[in-house]
Structures are given as structure tokens and as C-alpha cells.
Amino acid sequence: MEGSYLSAQENQPIPERLIPRSNSTSNLFALSSTFSKLNVRNDADYNYSNPNKKRHIYSGEIDCRSVTAARKFPVRSCSMTAAQQRKRTALFTVRERNSYHEGFNNDQDYVSQYQKPQYTFGVYKELTPYQLQRSKMKRSFQFPNGEIYKPKLDGKCTHSLKKPELNSRDSSLFKFSEKKGRNLSKDFVGPHNGTSVIHIPPNDTGYGVNSLELNTSVPSTIKSSVSSTSPISAVNTLTSLPESQTDDDDGYENKTVTISYCFENTVNEKHGSHIEKLDLSTKEKTKPTTNSGLFDRKKKTILGTEKYRCIKSQSKLKLGSVLKKLWRTSGNSNTKHGKKDTKRRRIPIDDMVTHSDGNSEAENDIELMDANLDGIEFDDDETLMDTDSIFDDLLSKENDKYDLRRRQLEIRQKLHETSHNDDGKVSFRDTEKHNVNEGLIDKTIIEEFSKLGEYIIDTRNQPPPRSSKRPSLDDNESARYFYNISTDLRQSLSGPISLPMHVGNDMVNRLRNDWEYIRFEDRRNSLPDSSFDKVETPPKPIKKDVRFAKEVCLASTWSSNAYERANPEFIMNRHRLLWMMKVHPSMNSAMNEIKLELNSYKKNEMVVHENSKCFTHYLI
């Protein structure tokens, strides 16, 4: 994979005061041979020549003089915000210095022996969609649906504090300067192996890097030859795209970086190799400036962030209001609760990292959101009313279930207490309760329930009332003969009927009123004789069909009139009684006594099969 191109404007004029005073101008572009590694191209030459042509700049044989790169290299168009554009442009800016002689000559008298060439280039490539999204997520923005995204501020600049890993091919070391305007002395000269030091002065804004300075001491008496093995050390920007170093031969993603070209300097051995190490001081990088404007923006950002977090907490207002109502026992507790909320929502200033460009957009979004939500007030009373009704319904259901089980147990206990003893006496406890509740009994209700006695029939002592349509037989023998005699004569009731023995005309006349045909079965004739028991006759197949019979078969059963049904008036009275109990709860005491009596009857007096007693229903 080929490396990225370096674009520059060839026809851009160089300021006169930045041109070094030299007798020869042919060595102004004597640069490192590492340019051939980067495949540096010129836009002007690229336009009129073949697009595949790559213009290389090789180093010359003569003395190396200072060269100052042009300001504001052209930036490839990409989808980025204005704040990110300004940060990237800051890397292409060359910090002007008063002197090229290590800061000691202030009258702009250039000395040809010690002149410091400064090179600052931006190596970049078109960002991938993943990189664009990642750079976008580093600052706050607003979604199309109105929601505001803001990155989490944990109070630590993890990207700037991360120590860059030095590649095996990178031998250059870095140092972030701690004082403004500090320069390297003449004694600190890059060693013979090609190492160099990048000097990054602090900027005025206090959060990024505006310029980078490359300080190398090159004696004029010795020709500076550029080492072909000099590596390229990349420093990532502190505020955006914090990735590892990029190399042209690697397949890593190219980001906006700053390239320092390392020159091989031939010096005396007495100077030694002085290498300044990387300073990872957290206090210096995150030290707030004394600028009043920056302090105001920081304070405004903190307030905006606090309001934004308060707005997010308002989504939990409904549940919080319910909890407040439960916890609100006194005025002091309410005051303490408010203090706790204030402490919980307070954000320490040390945990905030201000970005002047990125936070300006976030401040505008937060201020706009605060202006829209200032006049909104939440009605806690309505929320509490709705919540209370829900809780009341849930509690009432639970109470009903509990009361149902409790009442069932009480009924069984009362029935056990009111059970008669062997002497037929009622327990003393039940008698005492009856005396206490005697004054609460409503006579009208008792009268309504007294009608039940008319429909209660004791089936143990007497049979149900005899139906008028039931045939009357004198004795069991005649009844047996009546049910066993059968005839195949199907005659009309209008014609004469051959009656069997012991069947009177009066019974036949009664049956005519209900049925058209009357069949008499004589089981004595149908029974097989004992002499034919040994003879086996093959069974004849019986044809099964469905038909509507016009005859009746008499059997020992009861007629429909023998079973009395409930009176509709009683059902209406029962519904009216239940409605009165619901309207007047005071009637419950009298009703409970009646229910207790009915339940006692069901348990002790009502005749129930032994296997069906477990299915008995009691009134509750």
C-alpha cells in the first residue's frame, strides 16, 4: 500500500523576511531523502502532467539552509465541522519566531551558522465512514428527532495522557514543553543516529496545539546530509483522531498527524547524546488558563451540563413524585431530601474538560433546550392521583383475596363451634354472640328470607308429591305385571284397545290425553324358557336407525310435575336484597347471621353423599 501524498502550492509566494540570507538559492529545497518514501507530489506539476506521475524531491549536496513551509496547506475537502477544520488548520500553521539563533538574537540578524529549519506538514487521507462517525461522536450534536447527544465527560483526557507506542522503526522521542517560548539550548543536539526532538509550546486556548517547532542544531561548517534511514515520528492531535502512529508501508488508517523530519547531525563527541524524554504531566496539560473569557465559557459549560443532566432526570419525575409522597413525613425530611438532590446533581469542576470549539455548539444546544423547558411545570397532584388510583386498585384486589380466604376459615370455625353437642346444647360462645348481635338483626330481611321455607322439602321423611298423570296401581304385584306386559298392537286411541289383564280403562283414558300410542311390554313372554337355555341361537344383526316415535313406553319414574322449580319472584327478591346490601353496608351483620345459619344447615342437616361433601359450597 502506497503512502499518502503531500499536497503543497508551488506558486505560493514566500515572505521576504522568512527567506534566509544566503549567497546561493539552489539549496533551498535540500530536504531529506525520506520524501521519496512519502511520494511527495506537487499539485501544479500534477495537473499538467500525467496523473500517475509522482514527483520526488531529492536532497542536494550543498549546505542545508533554513526553509519555512508556506502557511495553510490546502486541506482536502471532507465532511467535517467548522471546529474540526480550525483544529486541523492549526497544525499547518508555522509559529513565527523572532530569531533563528535559538531565541537569543531579537534584532532579526540571521546567522548563517546556526539556523533552524522548521518543517510542519499534514499527512492525511480521506477518512472512512467509521472515522467520520467516530470524530462526530466526540462532540455533542442533535438528532433529527430532537434528542441531544453529548459525549461522556469523565474528567480525564485519556487520549492526551496515553503514551504513544514507539514503533521499532521510530527512534524519535517527543517532549511536550512546559513553558511558553522555551527553546532547546545549543548543547541539546540530536545524536548521530538520527533522533530528533519535537518541541510543542503550549497555546493560548489551553486545550490543543497550535504549532509545532522542530529544533535541530546544525553547524554551518559541516554539510548536513539527510539520513536515508531516518524514521518519521508522528504525533497525534490531542483533540481529534487519537490513533497510533502511521507509516507509509503499513496498512493502518492515515489520520491528521504532524511529521517531523529527522536530520542526521554530525557533532563533536564531547556534546554527547542528550535525549529529552516524553513529559506526561497531567497537571500541565489540563491546567486551566487565567483568561477571563475561557473561564466564563467553562463556567457556562458546567452550568449547561448541570441543567442538561437535570432535564434528563425529569423523565423519572412521575415515579419520583410517588416516592416523595411516601418519604415526605415532615418538613425537615423534605429539606434534607432537597439537599441530597443538590449534592447529587453537583458536578465537580475538576472533572470537566473544556473544548472551546466543540463545547460552543453544545452550549448553544443546551441553552436552546433550557429556553424551551423553562416555562414547563409538571403537575405533581395529577400524577399522584393517577398513581394512587392504580395502587388502590392493586391493594384492594390483594385485600379481597386475603379476606376471601380469611372469611372461609372463619366460617368453618364458626360452624365447628356451633355444632350441637351430644346433649343437643349449643356452645356458650355462640349463645353469647347471638345475644350481642340480637339488636343488629333487621326483621324485614328475615321476612324476605322466611319465604325460603315454603320451597324447602324434606326428602328424607316423605316422597315428592305424586303426579296426577302417574298411573295408580293397587299393589306391587299389579305394578310389576303392568310394566312387564307388552303388546305390538299400535292402534289409534280412537279405536278399541285390547287391554292386558289387570289394566283398567281409567288408566288408559288418562294416558290418551298425553300420548298417541301406548305400548305394553310383557317381559314374562320375552324371558327365555329354561328348556331353551342350552340351545344356542345365532344372534341376528340389529339394524340401527333414527326415527321420531309416536309411542310412549311406561317405566317406573316420576313425571315432570313431581319436580317443583324455583319461583321467579324469589329470584327478583334475591337480587333486590343483594343490591340493598351493597348500598347499605350496615345490613352485613344481619346477613352474616343468616349466612351462618344456612351454612350450618348445609354442613349438619342437609343430606349429601359421602363422596360429594367436599364439593359443598358455603355462603361467604
Swiss-Prot record:
A Gene Ontology molecular function term of the record: actin binding
Disulfide bonds: none
Modification type Phosphoserine: residues: 472, 526
Expression induction: By pheromone (alpha-factor).
Domain of life: Eukaryota
One GO BP annotation of this record: actin cytoskeleton organization
Keyword Methyltransferase attributed: no
Keywords attached to this entry: Phosphoprotein
Residue ranges, annotated region (Disordered): 1-20
Positions with biased composition (Polar residues): 1-12
GO CC list: mating projection base; peroxisome
Keyword RNA-binding found: no
Purpose: Acts in conjunction with the alpha-factor receptor to promote morphogenesis and adaptation.
Family indicated by similarity: To yeast YER158C.
Protein name per UniProt: Protein AFR1
Gene designation: AFR1
